[in-house]
Amino acid sequence: MPQMFRQGRFWVQLCVVVALIAFAGLLINNITVNLIRTGLGLDFGWLWRPAGFALAETALPYAPTDSYAWALTVGWLNSLKVILMGLLLATTLGVAAGAARSSRNRLLRSLSGGYVALIRQVPLLLQLLFWYFVAFLGLPDTPVGGLIHFSNQGIRLLGLNLSVEFCSVLTGLVVFTGASIAEIVRGGINAVSRGQWEAFRSLGLSEGLGLRRIVLPQALPAILPALTSQYLNLAKNSTLAIAV
């Protein structure tokens, strides 16, 4: 008998593999039986059946009578839109808040610090529900505003009609991710030698100009890895839109 058959570890591993195969077979059998019981199958024919539900935000024309495949396509485009807009706005907010945390102005430091501390302590799902039920559904029934029209039916901006659901998800993602980006930017700025700050001040450059031209370019290598992680988190967190 080969040596490996005499080892107890081999038989333990064999039993584990057999158990996993049996569990997978049982799982597949249960799925097949339940799908047949509900009138579905293991094919993709269900994709062409009527979806039967409405979507609050649609980048393309959609009706409940359209197929599941079209509903998935429209939903994918909605996710892509909120992710791209969220990345742009969250980066802008995060860089501004991170720069403010490194400012000499005590008021700016306090405001940005309070924003980061508050937002990072509250779960994102709770923030999304707040923006939806309290902030946007609390808007007036009739549109108000000039260039931007606000109402609890949605927001109209530069020819774009955004539903309250989309605005709630976008605002929540931007505010939440922006707080994390602010901390990343602050850390990157603090990693730059203080001599660089003294150098641009000695040249008579303003704080803002020195930050943009001297400090931030040097802080970028330290910021990018963590910033990429936050971008991925924003994309994953966009799935919480199902809550609103």
What are the language-model segments listed below?
Residues 1-244:
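Transmembrane alpha-helices and adjacent helix-loop boundaries
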